[in-house]
Structures are given as C-alpha cells and as structure tokens.
Design a protein with these regions (language model features):
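Short beta-strand-centered segment that lines the nucleotide-binding/catalytic pocket of NTP-utilizing
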Residues: 1-13, 23-26, 243
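Catalytic P-loop NTPase motifs of RecA-like helicase/translocase cores
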Residues: 5, 29-30, 63-64, 91-92, ...
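Residue-level signature of catalytic and energy-coupling elements of molecular machines
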Residues: 9, 24, 44, 55, ...
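Conserved, well-folded catalytic cores of nucleic-acid-processing
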Residues: 12-16, 28, 47-54, 61, ...
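Conserved C-terminal guanine-recognition region of P-loop GTPase G domains, centered on the G4
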Residues: 13-20, 38-113, 184-199
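Flexible beta-alpha connector loops of hexameric P-loop NTPases
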Residues: 28-37, 89
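P-loop NTP-binding site
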Residues: 152-273
Length: 273
C-alpha cells in the first residue's frame, strides 16, 4: 500500500558474486504538518547522501504529487537513478507498456528503465542483474546470511502493522503504530515430567496505539474478530520468519497526538535519521 513505510529499513541481497544493500526509505510528504511527516522526510533525504544508486519506483497505473516531489529531489542526485516501473502487469492493454516507458523516460535522464511486477516476480532477476552493474567493487558489508540490519522486535512490529493494514485497508492509513512491549524467547528444553522435548518458543506482547476510541473499535472489530484475525495472521508469518513457535498477545490502546509529539515518537522507536 502507498505511504506505509515509516522507517528507513536496510535489506540485504547477497548473491554469488555480489551483495546489494537496499535502503527502503519512507515516501516524501508534501505537507509536513505533523512531526512524523517531518521525520520521514528527513529519513528519505538523508538516505540519498549515503548510497551508490537510486531506484525510483513508480506504479504503472498512476502518478502522484509525492512522485513529483521525489522526482524533483532526484534531479539533483549525484548518483545514477534507475526508474523501476512496478505493476506493469496491471495495464489493461499490453501494447500500452512501451508508450508508458517512453513517456516516463522524459521525466529525467535515467541510467536505466526496468518494468517489473513485484507481486508476480516478473523481471526481478533482470532488475537484480541491472543493479549489480552499478555496485562498487569492495568486500561485503554484511554476512551472507544476514537479510536486514533491523532487530527481531522491529521485524515483529512490522509484521503486525502489515496485517493491520491488510485487515483495515485505508481506514487507518497513519493513525496507528505498533510497540513491542515484551519479546522473550525460551530455548528448547526437555520436559522433566514426561521426558519429551519442549520446542523453543518466543512470547511477544505488543500494543497497537490509535488516536481515538472509535479507531480502537475498528481495529478490534465485532466481538474481537478483526484483532483475532490480525494476531493469527501475524503469528503465522512470524513463525515462518523466526522458525519457531510464537505466542503473540495484542492489546489496543488510545494514545492521542502521538504522531505530532517528538518525545512520543522517539519513545515508540521513530527517528529522523
């Protein structure tokens, strides 16, 4: 969904002969009204100073004011910019793909233009090969097994937030955040009474903060149905991610004004760097 990334997140793609480190930034916000918007803009802008290559990702089916804002920033970039046109498979007429690419090519002097479908995995290998051409020759920055620089607590909060977005659609685009209150792992042991192995298990307690009580009711749903579904889906994904049993407990609390309070933002794990 658009405008859902709030943190600068590093993803690591290690291949046989290369390692690409992706910095997924929050989108730019034209109206810097709330503190969270200002922090997100700073995070996006600061990333441009530290990278060797920029991927400018656009949807094939639309052009937004925020796209225009990012484009103006990129025109002054000192590094190559690759235009990635996503959702190319959504075009009703496939003959419109080439004219679209030609039209987008006029936006600025792109180093490359690569159409893809992230959902279907179409042309992603070509994109990876294209990126590889622009990587500097140097030793890997991360171990080959590492896929991100973020903690397990952060990844857990992002999984929960993603499931909330999927359940609620556009009802709560910015007015919620997730805080991991407790993250404890019990290693695998042997049950003293039965002698049977007890698998490792991670116990996660998380709070979903919303602005208003009406939003709390939306997240919980009738008889708790939505919150239960969010928890179940998040637990399934976490068990795949962490490769162990997960016990997840969710609460929903009202915390008005959190997105315009810098102290509250920092206490919830937000940063402008």
């Amino acid at each position: 969904k658009p405008q859902t990334t709030r943190h600068k997140i590093v993803g690591i793609d290690s291949r046989e002969k290369s390692q690409a480190v992706f910095v997924d930034t929050p989108g730019m916000h034209k109206k810097e009204v709330r503190a969270i918007n200002k922090m997100m803009n700073k995070a996006a802008s600061s990333a441009l100073r530290d990278v060797n290559l920029v991927l400018f990702v656009l949807d094939a089916d639309k052009w937004t004011q925020n796209d225009e804002l990012v484009l103006e920033k990129l025109k002054n970039a000192e590094m190559p910019v690759i235009l990635v046109i996503n959702k190319i498979d959504t075009l009703e007429n496939k003959n419109h793909a080439l004219p679209l690419i030609q039209e987008r090519a006029k936006l600025m002097n792109f180093a490359e233009i690569v159409p893809v479908s992230a959902l279907r995995g179409a042309n992603l290998d070509h994109l990876r090969n294209t990126i590889e051409k622009y990587l500097p020759f140097q030793p890997p920055l991360y171990s080959l097994e590492q896929i991100t620089d973020r903690s397990e607590r952060f990844l857990a909060s992002e999984v929960i937030r993603e499931k909330i977005m999927r359940q609620l659609g556009e009802e709560l685009p910015y007015d919620l955040t997730v805080q991991i209150e407790s993250f404890k792992t019990e290693e695998a042991t042997i049950n003293e009474k039965t002698g049977r192995p007890k698998p490792a298990c991670t116990y996660i307690d998380a709070t979903i903060f919303v602005y208003r009580s009406g939003q709390k009711a939306i997240v919980i749903g009738e008889k708790g149905a939505k919150l239960k579904k969010i928890g179940m889906d998040a637990r399934v994904d976490m068990e795949k991610m962490f490769e162990q049993k997960i016990m997840l407990t969710l609460w929903v609390k009202v915390k008005g004004g959190w997105s315009d309070d810098e102290r509250a933002l920092k206490s919830l794990g937000y940063s402008d760097i």
